[in-house]
């Protein structure tokens, strides 16, 4: 056999479908993180495993590691704390409010692209340093939890009192395919901006491969005023206000240093591109020893304080204590030092006790005193160190726990007793739950209320479908659909919503007078279930819709209007709601929303078919309602969509609305959106639609619709499941 002929006959490295058809709809994002990639098995319960963990012992091991400097990657100042703070920060700091994706909740820093981002240089070493501890405690602590816990212990080991720590983050085992990190194909490019400096949604970082902002200033321009603009935008997009922003920057930069000892061109490829013998490590430097005092990461060479391994107010003391002038690091990066040679000898060297340095600052540090609003906060923190410490503790806790969902998911002995508004609190259940007879009585009340099937189903869907599996916000629990801002969202049809809620509140009030109680949150879901039950009965099928009470009603005071505003759908294919034309197609937005709802392609398909025949469009239009008998739970949507007697033609310039006409007579039959027609156009979705359009599929369709509906109604019922 010729040496040049590969004996393996497989598809690896070949041309993919997406190479041929780049605009092909991606459905793979609906089928991530299954048991096929997870070595733990379906029966593994991480919450139970974590409960058996001796957290104090783990912390003791981490504490010992802080000063156990390893020759293969020596600790700056003899302490790994600053490196571990950066590791935790950069794990949590990818979170963005726009779609709730990113963050520390899945341990995704272990995988591409994050493990190889330019901003994460040397964090591969940080994770290797804590591997012996992960190895020791095994599956009792996830990588995701360990990374954040290590950052907490790092702070505590350097004299800072943290607010607490919650476990419960479940590891993923493959890179996330659903997260849009930007359209750029080069590191540190910034095609994400348009206009004056409008950052593309939902992105929260200024350049590809950065966590937040460029520390040298926008695109490397050392302008502190312009840097402040970027800082405010990016931190706001990950849920931080000005006070929290200043505290996080100053608190983080109280410790450690940056690394720019030499020419960055001497640093080798990132982990994903490194040679196999480096075993997953990257950025191998050929500058001198490549480590310790010779390390190169960001290219900046900055130590902020005279006590870089101890909590202090020295960051602000130095920031306000000197006038600053621009200089360059040995690697050629823009940074700042005191004017007129001030500050000589006040900063220790990280590896040589005989050397001393001047303080240095980043352009983004100076933004904290150049920007008037940031300056007021910085000066207050400078003059009131205790207040600074308190705000930093709360902001750090928020940073590292923001994507974990409600505090009912938090695990461990260090969970703070205090509930915070950003956790979207919901009152605990304070009454016995309704029993089977109560549910039967309430169903009869709903049936006799005069509300239509489409009204109650649409309201329940609107309530539950706000859920995002990315950060576990939203959902039916809390009944926030009756509160600002959700009650006023156009997609929720405010007039119809107010009508439905008024009727349901009347039923609730009457029932609660009996001495028993049901929350409006439960009643909204129950009403939707009643609607589906009636629709199935209309179609001649008797069904039982699962309903599990236990939801409670949040108050307006427990609901941050600005925070919840980001949950408003810009489009919702499930309700044929597309008020604005985007560069992204309506079908892509549908798949994105389905992914946030943790739906599979079959679940998405059957829900679309069911919601259409139940007549739940947001604008009450008949677009996509491909049935002559609305409010009958039938497979008519699929039957009529795949009917070869119908031809379709666009009726709008944007080709987002279509008319279906009789192939022979030319008479109009239906109207549809791109979301509707994709189930006949896309080969994978058409295959699913064919299953439900078959003559023997009616019962399967109803069963599958009810299962998918129940899943969505219970997505935020963390009390019913533990990962």
From Swiss-Prot:
Its EC number is 1.11.1.21. PROSITE patterns: PEROXIDASE_1, PEROXIDASE_2, PEROXIDASE_4. Its cofactor is heme b. Formation of the three residue Trp-Tyr-Met cross-link is important for the catalase, but not the peroxidase activity of the enzyme. InterPro entries: Catalase_peroxidase, Haem_peroxidase, Haem_peroxidase_sf, Peroxidases_AS, Peroxidases_heam-ligand_BS. Bifunctional enzyme with both catalase and broad-spectrum peroxidase activity. This is Catalase-peroxidase.
């Amino acid at each position: 056999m010729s040496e040049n002929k590969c004996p393996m006959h497989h598809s690896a490295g070949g041309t993919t479908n997406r190479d041929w058809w780049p605009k092909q709809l991606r459905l793979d994002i609906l089928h991530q993180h299954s048991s096929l990639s997870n070595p733990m098995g379906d029966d593994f319960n991480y919450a139970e495993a974590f409960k058996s963990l001796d957290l104090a012992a783990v912390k003791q091991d981490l504490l010992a590691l802080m000063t156990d400097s390893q020759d293969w990657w020596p600790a700056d100042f003899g302490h790994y704390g600053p490196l571990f703070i950066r590791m935790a920060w950069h794990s949590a700091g990818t979170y963005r409010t726009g779609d709730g994706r990113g963050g520390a909740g899945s341990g995704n820093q272990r995988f591409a692209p994050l493990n190889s981002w330019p901003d994460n240089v040397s964090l591969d070493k940080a994770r290797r340093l804590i591997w012996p501890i992960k190895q020791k405690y095994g599956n009792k602590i996830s990588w995701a939890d360990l990374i954040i816990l290590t950052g907490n212990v790092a702070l505590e080991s350097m004299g800072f009192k943290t607010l607490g720590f919650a476990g419960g983050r479940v590891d993923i085992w493959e890179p996330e395919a659903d997260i849009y990190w930007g359209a750029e194909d080069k590191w540190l490019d910034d095609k994400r901006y348009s206009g004056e400096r409008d950052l593309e949604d939902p992105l929260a970082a200024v350049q590809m491969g950065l966590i937040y902002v460029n520390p040298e200033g926008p695109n490397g321009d050392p302008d502190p005023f312009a840097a402040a603009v970027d800082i405010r935008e990016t931190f706001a997009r990950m849920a931080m206000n000005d006070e929290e922003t200043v505290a996080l920057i100053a608190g983080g930069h109280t410790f450690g240093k940056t690394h720019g000892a030499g020419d960055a061109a001497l640093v080798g490829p990132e982990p994903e591109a490194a040679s196999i013998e480096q075993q997953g490590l990257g950025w191998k430097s050929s500058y001198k020893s490549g480590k310790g005092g010779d390390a190169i990461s960001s290219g900046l060479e900055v130590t902020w304080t005279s006590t870089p391994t101890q909590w202090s107010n020295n960051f602000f003391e130095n920031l306000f204590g000197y006038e600053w002038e621009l200089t360059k690091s040995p690697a050629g990066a823009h940074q700042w030092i005191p004017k007129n040679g001030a500050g000589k000898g006040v900063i220790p060297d990280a590896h040589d006790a005989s050397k001393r340095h001047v303080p240095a600052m980043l352009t983004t540090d100076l933004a904290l005193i150049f920007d008037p609003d940031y300056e007021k906060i910085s000066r207050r923190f400078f003059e009131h160190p205790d207040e600074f410490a308190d705000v930093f503790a709360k902001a750090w806790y928020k940073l590292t726990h923001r994507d974990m969902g409600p505090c009912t998911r938090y695990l461990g002995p260090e969970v703070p007793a205090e509930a915070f508004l950003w956790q979207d609190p919901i009152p605990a259940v304070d009454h016995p739950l309704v029993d089977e007879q109560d549910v039967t009585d309430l169903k009869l009340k709903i049936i006799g209320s005069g509300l239509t099937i489409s009204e109650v189903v649409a309201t329940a869907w609107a309530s539950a479908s706000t859920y995002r599996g990315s950060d576990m916000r939203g959902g039916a629990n809390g009944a926030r659909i009756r509160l600002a801002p959700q009650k006023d969202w156009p997609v929720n049809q405010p007039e119809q919503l107010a009508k439905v809620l008024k009727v349901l509140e009347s039923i609730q009030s009457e029932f609660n007078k009996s001495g028993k109680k049901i929350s409006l949150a439960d009643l909204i879901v129950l009403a939707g279930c009643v609607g589906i039950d009636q629709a199935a009965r209309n179609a001649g099928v008797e069904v039982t819709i699962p309903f599990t009470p236990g939801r409670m009603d949040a108050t307006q005071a427990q609901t941050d209007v600005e925070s919840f505003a980001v949950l408003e759908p810009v489009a919702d294919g499930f309700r044929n709601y597309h008020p604005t034309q985007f560069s992204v197609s309506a079908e892509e937005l549908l798949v994105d929303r389905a992914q946030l709802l943790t739906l599979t392609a079959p679940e998405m398909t059957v829900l679309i078919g069911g919601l259409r025949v139940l007549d739940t469009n947001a604008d009450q239009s008949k677009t996509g309602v491909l049935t002559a008998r609305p409010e009958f739970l039938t497979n008519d949507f699929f039957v009529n969509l795949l009917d070869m007697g119908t031809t379709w033609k666009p009726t709008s310039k944007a080709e987002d609305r279509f008319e279906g006409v009789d192939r022979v007579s030319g008479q109009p039959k239906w109207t549809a959106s791109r979301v509707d027609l994709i189930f006949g156009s896309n080969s994978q979705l058409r295959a699913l639609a064919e299953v439900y359009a078959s003559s023997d599929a009616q019962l399967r369709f109803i069963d599958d619709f009810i299962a998918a509906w129940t899943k969505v109604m219970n997505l935020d019922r963390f009390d019913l499941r533990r990962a």
